[in-house]
Amino acid sequence: MREVAVGVLVLAVFVIVPLGQRVLGLDGQPASAHRFAAFTFLVGLSVCPGVIALALTLPWFFACARFGVGRGVHLLRSAVAFRLEPVSEAAAGVFLAVGAGWGCIAALGWRPLGFAPITVLLTAVHFHFAGFAFGAMAIRVRRERVNRWTAVVAVGWMVGVPLVALGITTSSLIEPIGAVTLATTGGLLGLLVVERSVRHRSGWLAVSGASLCFAMVLAAGYALAQQFGFRWLDLEMMERIHGMANAFGFALCGLIGWSRIDRIMSRKDEPLCVSP
């Protein structure tokens, strides 16, 4: 299970995060610096936990923290600080930094609140994908469709992600509330992404939206079943199915789809060069 979690994090740090930043048009960092931070993060999670492993993961944490602080400063300096989009961008930056922080905790081998090592690692995965990748997709959809539904998705995501984490760390009663909130929000985002796939004729977005709907229904069903003592799916199998659907089906396909759409749109906007 650890190997799967590390593999999904590799996808996040090398592909999902830079692709999400590019799709949103937000400042990241130079490609060489990003590759160095991502590589050392991978090495830090692959060696024996300890101080050296922690040191190897710190470049990625600092890169994510820099991005998160940058979005926060932009929000505070913005004349439209109370608009949903800059708030969402800041939240995505914060969630990414939190995910990197949990990766550092996993590398150190620390077990806060007595968590199992795999739970610490999966929390890092949660914030990279449910935190950053989900947010990037929600923000991108809202840029095309500013309406109540995209607003509900943005707010539900910003509330649901910390609620799930809070439920895991404090109260088993909060966890299903957070899971259902995030699952409902995810299902709505999935439908909006499918709708956008029809508009743009994008198979990538169609796969992304359908994968998210499936993953969110699975997550909500699992959380509710656990709460009421009905164990129809073990944790390892749920994490594998849910994680793969979210990582590859939703996040990767969705961000590739938006990247391709943006590239096509930019070509259409290029002025024609007419020879005299």
Language model: regions and residue ranges:
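Hydrophobic alpha-helical transmembrane segments of multi-pass integral membrane proteins
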Residues: 1-274
